[in-house]
């Protein structure tokens, strides 16, 4: 880890705090430029969520964590474990880069977008979330933003927890971190979660057969990590985790064919790294291997039957990153190498698939008087579509003490996914989708209120679409996204308030029609307080109107889905210094709504849990 004092001295800027549960402006983040830096020096809007926040919200899924954050719009085909999509600032679900400990999530390689309904919440110790383009640092996918899920635990100790809730939900978790001598620590975790679920209905998406069954979810997780400090400057780590999930869902049925309504996902990841943390120079070398097997099958025949489908991908990654303190800032440079291989049949591709990508990048951060400058440039060499370059730049001006104006511009891209390139309807000549983004923002501290308001525009070209006549994918689509985002956090006596507002106008630039499944407006409000040792929390979310497709008849019709206001209530009580009990009511007023047309949401749900630490 970087020594905090040296970087704070090099980047000594006025403290501005973005929307986050951890409101300290000097909170260190690693996602912006791959090395730790104070959040106040990151000019892009940044949110940090800690494990303490997740426990206070009593979230049982990663999607429940992310839905609370500015700019995020989550859609899901029902309840726990069902297919979900993340839209950030109106961009496509495939325009979000999801990292696990700084390494690209493997599952995103098969489908082209990350489905975090499958990722275990037990592994999440911290989330760093950056909005806006970041391809100049990370390469493909980082058009709407970057979500970095960090699994490293900060504090030693052991925790045993259990929870129960509606729809026969149950969860059991054991985790421990122990110091072995002065220089070595080990972390272990095991988690089991299961819910019977409910019938998501899937109106218009099941073919000729109604499927009036519960659509449940089961997840089993193991995690282990070993960290060692060789000297004050040199350290290394090895970690691995895996999860085994089963999801029941409502599938499309064709008469005379098996009903593939069960999903079985196996995923494992292994990382190893070596870090050098000097006073002026920082360097890290990280290697990673991940392997996922994703079955969809009819449980009457089993996942090895010829009717079943299998998406299998292996991902190999090597990252070498370096950072040098220069003046009142730093310069960074590095190389990424990634190889993805698939087995025949993955993504409906008959043959096996192998794709390599090598990226080199340069980043810079510097303070000059009242100005802060940030920039990055990157070149990717891909075995499929050749070389592609991206860049971004930002400038911040503290025009009055405690108030800052920020202007930024960046380019980014999304590489075509496996099915689009080599599937039955694939086109190997596809180009990457490209984005140009502008943003202007004011932020400051006024009468105890940390606030930020920004306006942005994102023009996306060469969008990949499907042609009903040629039965092929092609580059032609264009999107124009305009938006306003406002965030604030403040205290009034014992009450802590966190609020955000998003207005997103995301349209097809050719037809001027709204992009599907994006809420035009969102309001999010979190209120926390303590009363007689009880920790209370109220969460409010307003989801505005959105459009979707009704697939129950042909030709498909566009439908308008009305807005909804949702409330959650959570409370926790420390029975002793070691034992805490928690309870939560989600969707307090039992609102009936959908985020994907035809797929029901859960309605009111209750959970009760307890944790014992020692």
Swiss-Prot record:
Membrane topology: Multi-pass membrane protein
Binding site for cyanocob(III)alamin: 83, 85, 92, 110-111, 251, 309, 517, 551
Keyword Zinc: no
Signal peptide stretch: 1-20
Residue intervals on the Periplasmic side: 21-157, 179-183, 228-231, 278, 326-327, 370, 401-402, 444-448, 491-493, 530-534, 573-584
Segments forming domain TBDR beta-barrel: 155-614
Localization terms from the record: Cell outer membrane
InterPro entries: B12_transptr_BtuB, Plug_dom, Plug_dom_sf, TonB-dep_rcpt-like, TonB-dep_rcpt_b-brl, TonB_box_CS, TonB_rcpt_b-brl_sf, TonB_rcpt_CS
Induction: Constitutively expressed. Primary control of btuB expression by cobalamin occurs at the level of translation initiation.
Regulation: Calcium increases vitamin B12 binding affinity by a factor of 50-100. (Microbial infection) Colicins E1, E3 and K inhibit cyanocobalamin (CN-B12) uptake; E1 and E3 inhibit binding of CN-B12 to cells while colicin K inhibits a later, energy-dependent step of CN-B12.
SUPFAM superfamilies: Porins (SSF56935)
Entry's Gene Ontology molecular function annotations: ABC-type vitamin B12 transporter activity; calcium ion binding; porin activity; protein domain specific binding
Binding locations of Ca(2+) 2: 213, 215, 249-250, 261
HAMAP family: BtuB
Record protein name field: Vitamin B12 transporter BtuB
Organism (species): Escherichia coli (strain K12)
